Design a protein with these regions (language model features):
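Alpha/beta-hydrolase-fold serine-hydrolase catalytic core, especially in secreted/extracellular enzymes
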Residues: 25-116, 121-129, 229, 295-299, ...
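Flexible loop/turn segments at secondary-structure boundaries
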Residues: 143, 160-162, 218-220, 241-246, ...
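Fungal secretory targeting signals
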Residues: 1-24, 415
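Cap/lid segment of the alpha/beta-hydrolase catalytic domain
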Residues: 135-206, 240-250
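Extended catalytic-interface subdomain
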Residues: 211-214, 236, 270-275, 279-304, ...
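Primarily recognizes the serine-hydrolase "nucleophile elbow" in alpha/beta-hydrolase
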Residues: 192-256, 264, 268, 279-280
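Structural recognition of the beta-strand scaffold that forms the well-ordered cores
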Residues: 133-136, 151-156, 210-212, 232-237, ...
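Mobile cap/lid helix-loop segments that gate and shape the active-site cleft of serine hydrolases
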Residues: 238-290, 312-320, 326-332
Length: 415
């Protein structure tokens, strides 16, 4: 029996052994309307990601996680942090290509927003042999990625939405008046670039897509991965608070927190998050919840040891191990990576530091690099006391849900 036939039969048997996706999962009701900040009890440790917003129900199976809890997390993250992602089904995206420039137009509700993107293709990329792509904002080490056979597409995020309270740019041309953060607006820009690549750039494989940015743009890249299931790999670099920095743990001594972030750049997120200022321990989620909402798709977290402001240590010893508990339980632990380096904030070396993992995900190129190492730090296990209470799951069945959900999720466009 050939290996391909063997894998086909094995996959079929695994799927037959599990409940059909067509069998509707009965989900606990999400409170409606969503509770206000004062309604939540303070919690010093990370919230249990397996517990629903009602505070009583708990996930028991992987099927339930994907069909019930993960969608609830996406809703509550929009309610309490990002603002509600626009209905993409009401948008019409068109694009024209002139050499290596994409001109993108998005129409919705009788309004139009426009911006552009730049295409950088590796040698040998063609319609017959399309390359994977990383879509980046704010700069990236193009040459390292191009040499590795990965296309790099960039766009000016300020043409989508400014980094200010101003309401200019393509996104606000369509959605002015909505309580939506700039991180979500920039994420929307990533997604519309991907639409344009699908339409006009056959040299790029639009099913193998990474998204990246650093600092506030790393927060935006995280939002891009969160809100579009076509994203294969999310690459938030030094993302800090409202990214993968934990709200409840500031371990650097001078770090970004909810208070100084909302004071300095309140437009990054919606107004509701501001109601948790000085009471972040009431938030019904933390950074690990955001990461878990992206599973089973891949994430690599870049952190510099000499980058205290974005709480690199907190991301490494609190967020990463807590999120990995969920990924491991889902049978996709290898999809979550941590890349600690010696440098500072947004060093270009960060992009080469994560490149072996990028190639493993986007090109199936094996790497010997250990992307689970927390060195020079160690996990703060007291931050997630629920770690010993993961829902039961037969180890032999762990990999099957990943196979079933990968196809369903990566073929689905933004919410």
């Amino acid at each position: 029996m050939g290996p391909y036939l063997y894998r086909t039969i094995l996959t079929a048997l695994l799927c037959l052994s599990l409940p059909s996706l067509s069998q509707a999962q009965s989900c606990p009701a999400t409170p409606s309307p969503f509770p206000k900040a004062a309604a939540f009890s303070t919690q010093a440790t990370l919230p249990d990601p397996f517990v629903y917003l009602d505070g009583k129900s708990r996930v028991t199976t992987q099927e339930e996680w994907y069909q019930c809890r993960q969608p609830e997390i996406l809703r509550l993250l929009q309610e309490y942090q990002f603002g509600y992602y626009p209905d993409h089904s009401a948008e019409t995206v068109t694009a024209t290509r002139t050499s290596n420039t994409l001109s993108i137009s998005v129409a919705a509700g009788g309004k139009t927003g426009t911006f552009s993107a730049s295409i950088n293709l590796p040698n040998g990329a063609s319609a017959a042999a399309p390359s994977p792509v990383v879509i980046a904002i704010g700069g990236i080490d193009n040459n390292a990625y191009l040499r590795a056979g990965v296309a790099v597409v960039t766009f000016d995020y300020t043409k989508v939405a400014p980094d200010s309270n101003g309401k200019t740019g393509a996104f606000w041309s369509l959605y002015n008046g909505k309580d939506i953060g700039a991180l979500t607006a920039w994420a929307w820009g990533f997604h519309r670039v991907l639409d344009a690549l699908e339409l006009r750039v056959p040299e790029i494989n639009s099913t193998l897509v990474g998204v990246t940015g650093c600092s506030r743009l790393g927060k935006a890249a995280l939002a891009a991965g969160l809100f579009d299931k076509r994203i294969t790999l999310t690459m938030p670099m030094s993302s800090g608070i409202q990214g993968l920095g934990p709200y409840r743990y500031s371990l650097s001594g001078q770090g970004e927190n909810l208070e100084n972030s909302k004071q300095g750049a309140p437009w990054w997120t919606n107004s509701v998050l501001g109601t948790f200022v000085n009471q972040a321990q009431r938030l019904p989620f933390d950074a690990h919840t955001i990461a878990a909402a992206i599973a089973p798709r891949a994430i690599v977290m870049d952190q510099g040891q000499s980058d205290p402001f974005v709480d690199s240590k907190g991301t490494a010893v609190v967020t990463y191990p807590a999120a990995k508990l969920v990924y491991d339980w889902l049978g996709v632990g290898k999809q979550l990576a941590l890349a600690i380096r010696s440098g500072g904030h947004c060093d270009n070396s960060g992009y080469t530091n994560v490149l072996p993992f990028v190639l493993q995900v986007l090109k199936s190129t094996p790497t010997t690099r250990d992307y689970t190492s927390l060195s020079p730090w160690t996990a703060m296990t007291t931050a997630y006391p629920w770690s010993s209470q993961s829902p039961p799951q037969a180890a032999a069945a762990r990999e099957a849900p990943r196979k079933r959900y990968d196809t369903r999720r990566t073929s689905m466009k933004g919410n």
